[in-house]
UniProtKB/Swiss-Prot annotation:
Serine/threonine-protein kinase. Involved in the control of the cell cycle. Required for entry into S-phase and mitosis. Probable component of the kinase complex that phosphorylates the repetitive C-terminus of RNA polymerase II. Residues 334-354 have a biased composition (Low complexity). It comes from the Eukaryota. This is Cyclin-dependent kinase 2 homolog. The modification Phosphotyrosine is found at Y18. GO terms for biological process: cell division. The active site is at D131. The keyword Metal-binding applies. The modification Phosphoserine is found at S230.
């Protein structure tokens, strides 16, 4: 079946991982949708495996906080998946807020709880998302009237639906220049403010935020046996340490680690681990959380890529150490690079964490590299029994920077001690020691947070608002 003659006001939103994504209005119903179109060429061996996985998964998923797939159209050589269009993705929503910071009670906690509710549903059905990041989480913004009507305590039995989205999967985790593939991004030339942005910036009363998890192109069903999972999953900044070690059998905890990184980003507007490559990413984890031991990460040596990754990260750390005979030198270099990377006036700002001086690097070099005595202390500690894995001194950091970094970024002020506890439980080295999605929903930081329950009503309102916007009534 073809989309020809079924849609009007068709606009290209961007290019997803496996095809083009468009926005259009159904002529018969007036419903505004996003549709992802893939073309299978004669050179292909068939429909891409990721597309098959996404179609199969989405056809079975029905939940308030998980994208709904409306329809799949087959018109050889094209395959078109029809989704509901959301207002924006979480990354863009955060960028729209003052100083890119979210209010803890009216924004951050409700968003966080709904994401965990979505993950609880997915994990309960043996689905591992494998690419959790702000670009794959979607937001519908509803005004105070809608909020007052629908804000009720959450129930474990929720059965709604909505959006889909994507973004790119670049190595450093940067957003695609095209923006999100199912959330429209007005160009500067349009110069208009969308209805959701007006609602988001109202000061009269809190809005209702409805959150959806999307983009299941990398998802896996846990019960289906496979020879080995690819470790090239989860955009680098949100990738768990076990995936960095090339774990072949990772499961639900990879999503939980990503949630810890997303949580921190919502609280501070900064990326938690902004490594330029996998070796630097692991080093930053060791700085923040302390180097792993047999107690904190008992399964570390069971992963196929552990030894190679440790060797590579050790070399990267040694290069940094050579630069810091005087510990201030490296920090000064970092600050100079940050100033040089500042966007020119009139250009689009990049992520705040990529422009601001790297606080984690500054703290690490002040504690671990600043003086010969600091490095000598590390050498002595690395030779002690505490270093149960006998890690090289370049990778041995026995005094975690977690507490200092939470204070330096004001994360501890933004989220309270209970929030810090939830964050830390997401960021455990050992996968089985991480909090589960079901446990997170009932964590003291989230347990009493109300979430929207008017699922089908939101679908109707979302479609109506987007249709009116399309025909310039809003």
């Amino acid at each position: 079946m073809s989309t020809l003659g079924r849609y009007r006001h068709v606009v290209k939103l961007g290019e997803g991982t496996y095809g083009m994504v468009y926005k259009g209005t159904e002529i018969q119903t007036g419903r505004v949708v996003a549709f992802k179109r893939m073309v299978v060429t004669s050179d292909d061996e068939g429909i891409p495996g990721a597309a098959i996985r996404e179609i199969c998964l989405l056809k079975e998923l029905r939940h308030n906080n998980v994208v709904e797939l409306f329809e799949v159209l087959f018109d050889p050589p094209k395959i078109t998946m029809i989704f509901e269009l959301c207002d924006c993705d979480l990354k863009r929503y955060m960028e729209s807020r003052p100083q890119r910071l979210l209010d803890a009670n009216t924004e951050m906690r409700p968003i966080l709880k709904q994401i965990f509710l979505g993950l609880e549903y997915l994990h309960g059905r043996c689905v591992v998302h494998r690419d959790m990041k702000p670009q794959n989480i979607f937001v519908n913004v509803r005004g105070p009237d809608f909020a007052a009507m629908t804000a009720l305590p959450s129930s474990p039995q929720q059965s709604m639906r909505v959006p889909h989205a994507g973004g790119t999967n670049g190595e450093a985790g940067r957003a695609s220049a095209n923006g999100n593939e199912h959330a429209p991004r007005p160009t500067a030339a349009e110069g208009s403010v969308s209805p959701w942005e007006e609602a988001a910036n109202t000061k009269d009363a809190p809005n209702q935020l409805i959150i959806k998890i999307g983009d299941f192109g990398l998802a896996r069903v846990e019960e289906i046996p496979v020879k080995k999972y690819s470790h090239e999953v989860v955009t680098l900044w949100y990738r768990s340490p076990d995936v960095l070690m090339s774990s072949a059998l990772y499961s639900y905890p990879v999503d939980i680690w990503s949630m810890g990184a997303i949580f921190f980003e919502m609280a501070t507007s900064k990326v938690l681990f902004s490594g330029r490559n996998e070796d630097e990413q692991l080093l930053r984890m060791f700085w923040l959380l302390g180097s792993p031991t047999k107690e904190t990460w008992p399964s570390m040596m069971t992963y196929t890529g552990t030894m190679e990754r440790l060797e590579r990260s050790s070399r990267a750390a040694a290069e940094r150490q050579d630069l810091t005979v005087n510990g201030d030198v490296y920090v000064q270099q970092q600050q100079l690079q940050a100033q040089q990377q500042q966007p020119q006036q009139g250009s689009s700002p990049s992520h705040s964490s990529s422009r601001a001086p790297d606080l984690l690097t500054q703290l690490a070099h002040k504690r671990f590299y600043h003086s010969e005595s600091a490095m000598q202390q590390r050498r002595e500690s690395a030779s002690s029994a505490a270093n149960s894995y006998r890690l090289p001194v370049e990778l041995w950091f026995d005094r975690p920077l977690f507490k200092e970094y939470m204070a330096a970024t004001r994360c501890d002020v933004s989220v309270s001690p209970e929030g810090i506890d939830l964050l830390r439980r997401c960021l455990m080295y050992e996968p089985n020691q991480r909090i589960t999605a079901a446990e997170a929903v009932h964590h003291p930081y989230l347990e009493r947070v109300p979430v929207p329950t008017a699922g089908s009503l939101d679908v109707l309102i979302s479609s109506l608002m987007q249709t009116m916007e399309t025909i310039h009534l809003l």
